[in-house]
Amino acid sequence: MNFFQRFTFLFSAPVFDADDLEGLRLQQIMAAIEHMGFQVVKARRIEDAEIAVQTDAAIGCMVVDWGKKGLEGKAASLIALMRRRGLEMPIVLLVRRKRFEDIPVEVLDFIDGYIFLAEETPEFIAKNLVSRLKQYAETLKTPFFGALSDFAEEGNQLWTCPGHNGGIFYSRSPIGRIFMEHLGEAVFRDDLDNSVLELGDLLTHEGPALQAQKEAATIFGAEKTYFVLNGTSASNKIVLSALVAEGDLVLFDRNNHKAAHHGALLLGGGTPVYLPTERNSYGLIGPITPASLDEATIRAAIAASPLVKDPEAATRRRPFRVAVIEQCTYDGTIYNAQKLLEKIGPLCDYILFDEAWAGFMKFHPIYAERFAMGLRELGPDAPGIIATQSTHKQLASFSQASQIHVRDRHIKGQRRRVEHRRFNESFLQHASTSPFYPLFASLDVGAQMMKGRSGEVLWDDTIRLGIELRKKLRAVRREFDEKESDPVRRWFFDPFVPDRVSIPDVAREGGTHDVPWESLSTDQLASKATYWEFKPGAAWHGFANLAPGLAITDPNKLTLLTPGLDRTTGQYEAHGIPAPVVAQYLRENRVVPEKNDLNSLLFLLTPGVESSKAGTLVSALVAFKRLHDDNALLDDVMPEFVARRPARYRGVRLRNLCGEMHAFYRSANISELQKAQFRAEHLPEPAMTPYQASRYLVRNDVDYLPIDEIDGRIATTLFVVYPPGIATIVPGERITERAKPMIAYLKAFERAENLFPGFGAEIQGLYREVDASGVIRFHTYVVRE
């Protein structure tokens, strides 16, 4: 099947039968199209055609029967729907000569051609339609994927890497053949060596590879875009390796992903000045504490840092080489980037916005002023702006696909600017000389999918689906509250959005009144960021220190809170349902959340999520509630899990396990520890820079100790609970009384590993060792002193 034959024809007409002349002519046209190797889809009703155009993106040409007055307006509405959704395939009207005058001007604007059944032969009409489809399909060929597809169709015989030679090597082995059939032949044929000159150079950015990145830059609002093939972890390292040299000051959001630590501090050798951040009682990741963004506070932090040796650093006009900001956290806290620019921009040469979790913000107006490439008023005194995005997270790309967007022409000619040639030297340090071409092609295609009206429609649909899903969850919860006679059963999972919001009061000029969030129309909720805002003092979000308009919760992150904490006070309740238990149940029922914390579950919303999947999620959550309330045996609730750990869980009941685990975390006061370890007063004392501490680890000048024995010692690894991948202790920090919440938090996880096997978290920088008595103990490396 060639490139063009991957597209189909849609015929929308009430008559396809060959027992009348019109039906016979249609059959002959469709048969001629099929004879040329194309598939034809038939829709007798306009409603069926509407479903087809919204669900089948392979339609390359549509033929619509105009009928009597446009089938009472239905044909016109179908055509308008297609164009409104940004669908640009050719539309050809099947029309009778006497009804041609019925077609209104607004429809004529959308039409590419006409078929009069009484004229021309079926074979000629079919050729004309195929020609139109090919012209349309040609416009969809993206720079790199188009060239890759053309090369694949040439049938070139390759004597190059990779050794599997288009998959043939795999076909010589039974399991290799199965592997090849599982993935499909095309991915092996497209796995090419960089000696294929027709595709350009992915490292020096030439040919189709360069053109793909140029067009992506235009689509995402950047001046220059780099495609990166080993994740945003690598993108951040590329950017920060290009910007930061040993001793440079880095203004560092304590919410940053571990890759930012690697790039700026462990590889670059930068000296951090940290911005403390908020957590709520559920452990959700909140914004930077507003007071810490004040210039005077930041300059005071520079002056107070024992790592800053330059006595004049705090008074320099631009003390920081770069500020690194987690623009969208894993839990969906998104900043107003314009406000951050106004606050910290004058202090920095560059700002790196890590948008790994929100590469879609360019494509919906609700995110206005919240993404780096949309920043306004960038003059010669502004910092250079860089954004990194994990296109594989919620955009359409293969895993590990990432991109770097740059806007820094406004500082051209200034010494602080890193021009392309120097930046690319850093790119080359972190890029493989054997890139995976299908991965690069996925970045090219993923960008083009967002082009024009199409991207806006896709993300608007997604946000609306998320709103409707949250409304349904609130409705289910309300029903349980109203209908359950037993108070113990009056609960359900609650979406992390406001309980009530303020709207204008039509009865009082300038007045407002509060209404339930879910009572607002989907149009309102999908268009105004104020209904997603973390407003200071609002109980629903639980963040103590906020500034007006600083942050919102992301409509495309569906966070569900589990019972166990009073949402108003943040205090533990008598009984709770830990999220790890819910997540395990869902996985065994083939519903896989993105992540869970102790009291929350995260589900990602993308254009790949459909209503049926949303309905399945609601049903699974209701089923879990029934099993919990009936205190069902774990053997029945999660049999696969119990079968792996029968000694601990066989015969245990679901509600009892939830209560036991909840009581454990309540006794350890985990909720308070999660908040405390990111507060300014608990950020550990820095004894040396992260880079210096990491050298001790490399040279093996370290002691390997259980965490019970590291008081007063200097860390050499990042202590990272994963997810979300945020460091609680950084190399070079001395573990003293200030770090008590971090150590207490990790010790609680250590005890939980032994009490609740199978529900443990991934913790990087610490290592599980089993002592002589069979107890798991966490160990780590500290500087040998």
Feature names for model-found ranges:
Residues 2-9, 57, 88, 222-223, ...:
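A short, charged/proline- and glycine-enriched loop
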Residues 15-22, 47, 65-74, 97-100, ...:
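Short acidic, S/G/P-rich loop/turn micro-motifs used as interaction or catalytic elements
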Residues 43-46, 51-55, 65, 76-80, ...:
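Conserved PLP-enzyme active-site core in the AAT-like
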Residues 185-234:
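Conserved N-terminal alpha-helix of the aminotransferase class I/II PLP-enzyme fold
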